[in-house]
Amino acid sequence: MTYTDTVRKTFAITTPLYYVNDLPHIGSAYTTMAADAVARFERLRGKAVLMITGTDEHGQKIQRTAESNGLQPQEHCDKIAAGFDALWQKLNIQYDRFSRTTSPRHEAIVKEFFGRVWDKGDIYLGQQKGWYCVSCEEFKEERELLEGHRCSIHPNKEAEWRDEQNYFFALSKYQSQLEALFQERPDFIQPESRRNEVLSFVAQGLQDFSISRVNVDWGFPMPVDPNQTIYVWFDALLGYVTALLDPDSEPSLEKALEKWWPINLHLIGKDILRFHAVYWPAMLMSAGLPVSGHVFGHGFLTKDGQKMGKSLGNTLDPVELVNRYGADAIRYYFLKEIEFGKDGDFSETRFVDIVNADLANDLGNLLNRTLKMVQKYCNALVPNVNGEDIPADHPLKAIGLELSDRTSVAYEALAFSEACREIFTLVRACNKFIDEQAPWSLYKQGNSAAVEQVLYAVLESVRLSAYLLSPIIPNISTDIYQQLGFSLNFNEKTLINNSVTYDTHATWGTLPAQQQLGEPRPVFVRLEQA
């Protein structure tokens, strides 16, 4: 799988619009860290990038949660949305748009989109009977429920029996078009396991789904029936479209879609796959709009091999984690250690071991000891060596020359683990190379030319590694670059394309000779086991 579109110069990526029933959990952080890494990588490559995140703020569950806390629904939404934004700042998430589905601009988009689908004849009034999970905000079929009519996703909450008139979207009308989409674009849904889930679901025959609710005040009124409110998914999915609007533009579909549509990549958890891979493309087809590029559903997270839950007392608070360990350590562990797309586990012991071994020992110590040798042997200047003069079969150059291509393939496949493995192959080769070449011995022998070539090759390999790791650990990469004499911050996204040309910086051998180096300092302080 690759999300790359070589024709378009723009790149739009979304996280889900997170439901504001509660403060963000580690799963929300995981999705958003991955999306941020992709967005940063595409900015490095010179694309105009739009990263969208935000909050889904309507529905009965929100209304009930707000009431139970003695708040008005909007007060509750404002509080939780601020919590998401605060966590994104702590995790160094560089989103471009934060979409909130309670905004007046969003209501205008929803009404216009509804009008298109209504005019197409794809919305009708019907009777809905069945078991309704308030937490999922959807009706459940009998086969989806556990004993006692409990939702399999929310087993602690019993579903409610509902018998009401609602408006429906004619999803079944798009059965053949969706099947054609999945056949013509086999990489539309990824990974393969998620695609197979969707194909199996669609093969059972699609059922029309309700897009309105009665007796729910917290939502946009139905344009054709003010006694009903628009159901959360027909409202929430359009938050991606609203986010495409420039801040000062009129809220219309034409304005929203003129630059960034179709969105290249929706990153989601597998629990909301059906809505993004089936409902959403059918809605877009009905409105006469192009379908998004790709939908990627990642796996669930466990802790110490167990499913997380408040009842088990083993939830992971992402705010507490980042306050204790720092953003880069958290980003690195979750993106490197968990194969994106599969379920993954967090173990605090393993977390500390991994980041200490990779970031403190292999990468941090390598930079530190090399800079100290350059201080001692080369007056704190990059050795006077031209990277082009180093033979192609040099043990570090041979890896470095292929590293950008190999890492790009991994990033494009959302294989963050593989990208890290490729990069650390070079880092570990550097440590081995220094030990074998022993520049301190070469210096004592008076072989200054050999010393300079050894140290240049290592410094350049560290630079390239930091550059290619910057989408994942931007703070550490910035620190490394600045110690190597560059006045560069990988967090300055508006400047990154101008100051860091990808073709130059992703190529081994471009570290300028005689560049003044900074004072060596640790880029990552070892963590202690709790």
Predicted segments with their positions:
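Basic, alpha-helical terminal appendages of large translation-related enzymes
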Residues: 1-10, 50, 54, 126-131, ...
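Structured secondary-structure scaffolds
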Residues: 2-53, 105-109, 155, 160-376, ...
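Short, charge-patterned binding micro-sites
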Residues: 55-61
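A charged helix-plus-loop insertion that forms the helical arch/lid used to bind
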Residues: 65-78
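A broadly conserved sequence feature marking short terminus-proximal activation segments
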Residues: 76-132
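Cys/His-rich short segments
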Residues: 120-175, 179
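Long, amphipathic alpha-helical stalk/connector segments used for oligomerization, subunit docking
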Residues: 339-342, 346-350, 355, 370-419
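Generic structural concept
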Residues: 360, 364, 397, 401, ...
